Amino acid sequence: MSQSLIFDMDGTLFQTDKILELSLDDTFEQLRSLNKWHTVTPIDKYREIMGVPLPKVWETLLPEHSDEVREQTDAYFLERLVENIRIGKGALYPNVREVFSYLKENDCSIYIASNGLIEYLNAIVNYYDLDNWITETFSVQQIQTLYKADLVKTIIRKYNIKKAAIVGDRLSDINAARDNGLVSIGCNFDFARKDELSHADMVIDDLIELKTILPRLNK
């Protein structure tokens, strides 16, 4: 039976922190110029909630602002993220391409399941030519709920997946695996938290470790 791996994007494949602070600063500078924000950019608070869907992000970072301002801020933030990706400010984590090549050579299907928006995800996939390996990229924007477990369920149904593991750095990835009866592989990377990773079936410190894990998953 062929194996599938479903990857998170932010903090798992893509080093979001390379463009995060830059884009968030751009966004809050815009708010300051409009007299809608009067203090420093709340980067630390954003890091705490990294990985949640963007509507929840703006509820947390802009609790006193109207929905209209949050929507405008969301749109501007997305513009800045995409532009910073397109001009090469971001980076993949080490060994992404090597691992993807290995997985494809070993008949493993690769999918992305992310809380990121479609335009943002497409910018990453296109800039780094990840479509050479990825079967399809899925965004939480494509489903009614904002739960990653439901997004993973969509992938499983569409491709009739019988055997898979989810690779990600946050509890939402681990829970998505558990709720769908899949193996969870936690990534101990930049945004990971030890208390969350403790719930994963296994934990890696580098994506290259997937080359040794894959044969075990196939047993």
Please annotate each region the language model reported.
Residues 1-7, 163, 219:
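Non-catalytic pre-domain segments flanking phosphatase-related domains
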Residues 2-94:
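N-terminal helical cap/lid subdomain that shapes the substrate entry/recognition surface
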Residues 46, 130-146:
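A short, structured active-site edge motif that brings together acidic residues
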Residues 83-112, 122, 149:
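Short, acidic loop-to-helix structural element flanking the phosphoryl-transfer center
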Residues 97-104, 156, 174-178:
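Surface-exposed amphipathic alpha-helices with a cationic face
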Residues 148-174:
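Conserved Lys-Pro-Asp/Glu-containing loop-to-beta segment of HAD-superfamily phosphomonoesterases
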Residues 166-202:
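Acidic, Mg2+-coordinating phosphoryl-transfer loop and its flanking beta/alpha structural elements
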